[in-house]
C-alpha cells in the first residue's frame, strides 16, 4: 500500500483561469471535470510500487502546484526535480518514479497551468510568460525549503528548467535537458532543405488564433477516441503497467481542462511551434559551474543538435550529450530502464 498524505483538492480553474465563452461551454460538451482528471491520475499512479506523498504546494496569488514527493525523508542527497513537457502531467513519469527514487528524494509536479495545478491567466508577452513559469518554480522550491536541486525537464519542461537555471543558478546542482523544446531558432524558409508545403502554411495561418490543443475540446465527447487514434503509441509505451486506456484517458483529461498553460505556451511560440525567444541565444550565459547533460532519443524526430550547440556555446563548462537507442521523443517512456540508469548516473556525479 502506498503511504499517502491527506489530499487537498486543487481546483484547476481557480485563480482567474477562465477563458471566456469557450470555457463556459466546455463542461456540457467535453466529458471531463477536475474529478475526472483526479481519477485518471490516480489510475496512472496506482501501479507505482513505492510510497509517496502528494500535496498542493501553495504559491502566490492563491495558486497551487500539485506535487508528488518520493523518498523525501532522505536528506543526505540532492533532490531530483522532474518537469514534464507540453500537454503532459506528472503521471507520465509513472515508469520512472520507483527506480529514480531508490537513493535520493524525487519531486515531480504539474507545471502551473497544466495537470492538476492551478490554471491562472498568463500574460500575452512571451518574456513575461516565461518569467511567470520560472517564478512559480522558484516559489515552489521556497515553499518546500529545498536548498539545491538536480533539475530535469522534458520538452517544454527542459526549456523552463534552462530558464530557471539562468535566473537562479545557485539553486541548480545539475541541469538535465531531455529532448528540450525551444532551443534552436526557426530556420529561414529559404534555408530549409524541404520547404513547408503551401497547404501546411495555410492551415497554420488558419489555426493561429486557436490554442494548440483546441481540437480536442472542439471534438467534445469524441476527443478521447481522437487521442486514442492519433496517439496509439502511448498505450504501447506504458503496456508494462496498463493493459487498458489508462494513459490516453489521463492525457485527454489533462488537456481538455481550462487551457491556461496551453495558452501560455502558444504565446511563447511563432508558427509551426518554434520559440519566440530561443534558448540557444541565451544558454551561453548560464553560470559556468552548472554542469549540463542533454538526453535525446536516437529515433526522435526532434532536432537532436541542441546538445552539440550547447557544447559550442559553453566550451569551458561541463556539457554531455547522451543518446538513448531505440527511443523517440518520449525517451523516459520508450526506454525507461535505460533512461533511469543514465539519469541515476548523472545524479551520482552530484552526490
UniProtKB/Swiss-Prot annotation:
Matching entries from Pfam families are given as: Abhydrolase_1
Q: Tell me what reaction this enzyme catalyses.
A: a 1-acyl-sn-glycero-3-phosphate + an acyl-CoA = a 1,2-diacyl-sn-glycero-3-phosphate + CoA; 1-(9Z-octadecenoyl)-sn-glycero-3-phosphate + (9Z)-octadecenoyl-CoA = 1,2-di-(9Z-octadecenoyl)-sn-glycero-3-phosphate + CoA; 1-(9Z-octadecenoyl)-sn-glycero-3-phosphate + hexadecanoyl-CoA = 1-(9Z)-octadecenoyl-2-hexadecanoyl-sn-glycero-3-phosphate + CoA; 1-(9Z-octadecenoyl)-sn-glycero-3-phosphate + octadecanoyl-CoA = 1-(9Z-octadecenoyl)-2-octadecanoyl-sn-glycero-3-phosphate + CoA
Q: Activity versus temperature? A: Preincubation of the enzyme for 10 minutes at temperatures above 35 degrees Celsius decreases acyltransferase activity subsequently measured at 30 degrees Celsius. Acyltransferase activity is reduced by approximately 60% following 10 minutes preincubation at47 degrees Celsius.
Q: Which GO terms describe its cellular component?
A: cytosol; lipid droplet; nucleoplasm
Entry-linked Gene3D superfamilies: alpha/beta hydrolase
Which residues does this entry mark as bearing Phosphoserine? Answer: 124
Family as reported in the entry's similarity comment: Belongs to the peptidase S33 family. ABHD4/ABHD5 subfamily.
Question: Which PANTHER family does UniProt cross-reference here?
Answer: 1-ACYLGLYCEROL-3-PHOSPHATE O-ACYLTRANSFERASE ABHD5, RE40534P-RELATED
Q: What does this protein do?
A: Coenzyme A-dependent lysophosphatidic acid acyltransferase that catalyzes the transfer of an acyl group on a lysophosphatidic acid. Functions preferentially with 1-oleoyl-lysophosphatidic acid followed by 1-palmitoyl-lysophosphatidic acid, 1-stearoyl-lysophosphatidic acid and 1-arachidonoyl-lysophosphatidic acid as lipid acceptor. Functions preferentially with arachidonoyl-CoA followed by oleoyl-CoA as acyl group donors. Functions in phosphatidic acid biosynthesis. May regulate the cellular storage of triacylglycerol through activation of the phospholipase PNPLA2.
Q: Supply the name of the protein.
A: 1-acylglycerol-3-phosphate O-acyltransferase ABHD5
Amino acid at each position: 500500500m502506498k503511504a499517502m498524505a491527506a489530499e487537498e483538492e486543487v481546483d484547476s480553474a481557480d485563480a482567474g483561469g477562465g477563458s471566456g465563452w469557450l470555457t463556459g461551454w466546455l463542461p456540457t460538451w467535453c466529458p471531463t471535470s477536475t474529478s475526472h482528471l483526479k481519477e485518471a491520475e490516480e489510475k496512472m499512479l496506482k501501479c507505482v510500487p513505492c510510497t509517496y506523498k502528494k500535496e498542493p504546494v501553495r504559491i502566490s496569488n492563491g495558486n497551487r502546484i500539485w506535487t508528488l514527493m518520493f523518498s523525501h525523508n532522505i536528506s543526505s542527497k540532492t533532490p531530483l526535480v522532474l518537469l514534464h513537457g507540453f500537454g503532459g502531467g506528472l503521471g507520465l513519469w509513472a515508469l520512472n518514479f520507483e527506480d529514480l527514487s531508490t537513493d535520493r528524494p524525487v519531486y515531480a509536479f504539474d507545471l502551473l497551468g497544466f495537470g492538476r495545478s492551478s490554471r491562472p491567466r498568463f500574460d500575452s508577452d512571451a518574456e513575461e510568460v516565461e518569467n511567470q513559469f520560472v517564478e512559480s518554480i522558484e516559489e515552489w522550491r521556497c515553499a518546500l525549503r529545498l536548498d539545491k536541486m538536480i533539475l530535469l525537464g522534458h520538452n517544454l519542461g527542459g526549456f523552463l528548467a534552462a530558464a530557471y537555471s539562468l535566473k537562479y543558478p545557485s539553486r541548480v546542482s545539475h541541469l538535465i535537458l531531455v529532448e528540450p523544446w525551444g532551443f534552436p531558432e526557426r530556420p529561414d524558409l529559404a534555408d530549409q532543405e524541404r520547404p513547408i508545403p503551401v497547404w501546411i502554411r495555410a492551415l497554420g495561418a488558419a489555426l493561429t488564433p486557436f490554442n494548440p490543443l483546441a481540437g480536442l475540446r472542439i471534438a467534445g465527447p469524441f476527443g478521447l477516441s481522437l487521442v486514442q487514434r492519433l496517439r496509439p503509441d502511448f498505450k504501447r509505451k506504458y503496456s508494462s503497467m496498463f493493459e487498458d486506456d489508462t494513459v490516453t484517458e489521463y492525457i485527454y483529461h489533462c488537456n481538455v481542462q481550462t487551457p491556461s498553460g496551453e495558452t501560455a505556451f502558444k504565446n511563447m511560440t511563432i508558427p509551426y511551434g518554434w520559440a519566440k525567444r530561443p534558448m540557444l541565444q541565451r544558454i551561453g550565459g548560464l553560470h559556468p559551474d552548472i554542469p549540463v547533460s542533454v538526453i535525446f532519443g536516437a529515433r526522435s524526430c526532434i532536432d537532436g543538435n541542441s546538445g552539440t550547440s550547447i557544447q559550442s556555446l559553453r566550451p569551458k563548462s561541463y556539457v554531455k550529450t547522451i543518446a538513448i537507442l531505440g527511443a523517440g521523443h518520449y525517451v523516459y517512456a520508450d526506454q525507461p530502464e535505460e533512461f533511469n540508469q543514465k539519469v541515476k548516473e548523472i545524479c551520482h556525479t552530484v552526490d
